[in-house]
A protein has these predicted regions:
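Cofactor-pocket helix-loop regions in the catalytic cores of large enzyme subunits
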Residues: 262
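Anionic-ligand anchoring segments at beta-strand to alpha-helix junctions in alpha/beta enzyme folds, i.e.
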Residues: 285
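N-terminal localization/anchoring segments of enzymes in phospholipid and broader phosphate metabolism
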Residues: 1-257, 275, 279, 288-324
């Protein structure tokens, strides 16, 4: 069928034994001499807020820094961890790792931090699909370097990307945090679309500390300041926001929901979105891969769904819920 629909000659088809390793396509794309068939090469740009001579901690204290990869360089994220490893005022570094590159500067910086006498705690997710063996090896290396390695909560996969740096300053201890939608992988950061933020907001720092305490098994937070953490708290917050807009629409007030995500398969949230749309809420969202359609949620119709195919894997998840 594929040959017929694409008008492919039988001489262009090659049969092989076993599954095809598609990673060879990356090497093929890198061959020289075929620039006519390639998209223009994009060079990640520097982050304006960091284009001065101040150290990264000084820049973060000036205000939160939003990062948008690969359009902006991933270097500030690597630099954040590396600076923390070498800064004599830094007391501790805590980080979650899901996937990293083969020769990871992040891993090297964490090992350097431990060697410099800092308290380094790293959650390495051993259930990261296709990277189980790599992550076991990274965990062993980090433990050998003196890092405290943890493996998360039983029955759950830790997919969050968080770095917490605890630093002693003139006015006391300050917590610096990086939150991101993408892995701490300097290679894929050049290909995948992700967002991140560097901040020293005290409430986010407190939440990040609570996340690591929870992942370490020390305690479970009673409440959160800014963060919403799955699987216990995130869905409930989304449902409350969606239902708030539904009530605004039913009362005749403006109501609007915009969302962009990597995948939407939660039927409870999907049902709430359909209910909001039927109540008059303007619902617009884009899903990159998977979407449970109206046929899976009986009684509702889709009122504003779109998907797209682009050059890069887009794993940014955004929600905007607004009303008057």
């Amino acid at each position: 069928i594929i040959r017929r629909e694409l008008s492919i000659n039988s001489q262009d088809i090659f049969e092989i034994n076993g599954p095809l390793d598609l990673t060879f396509l990356m090497k093929m794309y890198g061959l020289e001499g075929f620039e006519l068939f390639k998209a223009p090469r994009y060079v990640p740009q520097p982050v304006p807020a960091l284009m001065n001579e101040d150290d990264i901690f000084t820049n973060i204290r000036k205000g939160d820094i939003l990062l948008h990869h690969p359009y902006q360089s991933f270097d500030p994220v690597v630099g954040f961890v590396r600076s923390a490893a070498r800064d004599p005022e830094v007391l501790a570094i805590k980080q979650t790792l899901y996937r990293v590159s083969g020769n990871s500067p992040i891993i090297a910086a964490l090992a350097e931090a431990a060697d410099n006498g800092k308290q380094v705690s790293v959650l390495v997710e051993l259930k990261a699909r296709f990277d189980e063996e790599n992550n076991i090896n990274w965990a062993k290396m980090l433990e050998k370097a003196g890092c405290h390695v943890i493996y998360g909560l039983v029955g759950l996969k830790t997919h969050s990307k968080i770095t917490l740096v605890v630093r002693m300053e003139e006015d006391g201890i300050r917590r610096y945090v990086h939150l991101g939608t993408g892995n701490y992988n300097d290679s894929t950061a050049k290909l995948y679309t992700d967002c991140g933020i560097l901040t020293c907001n005290p409430q986010i720092g407190e939440d990040a500390t609570a996340v690591f305490n929870m992942l370490s098994g020390y305690s479970e937070p009673l409440a959160w300041n800014k963060l919403s953490v799955a699987p216990l708290w995130l869905r409930g917050r989304f449902l409350r926001m969606i239902r708030r807009e539904t009530e605004h629409a039913r009362a005749g007030r403006p109501a609007h929901i915009m969302a962009k995500m990597n995948s939407l398969c939660d039927k409870e949230i999907i049902t709430a979105l359909y209910e909001a749309s039927c109540a008059g809420v303007k619902v617009e969202f884009t899903d990159d891969f998977n979407f449970v359609t109206a046929k899976d949620v009986e009684g509702y119709l889709n009122k504003g769904y779109g998907s797209y195919i682009g050059q890069r894997l887009d794993s940014v998840d955004l929600r905007k819920v607004e009303s008057v």
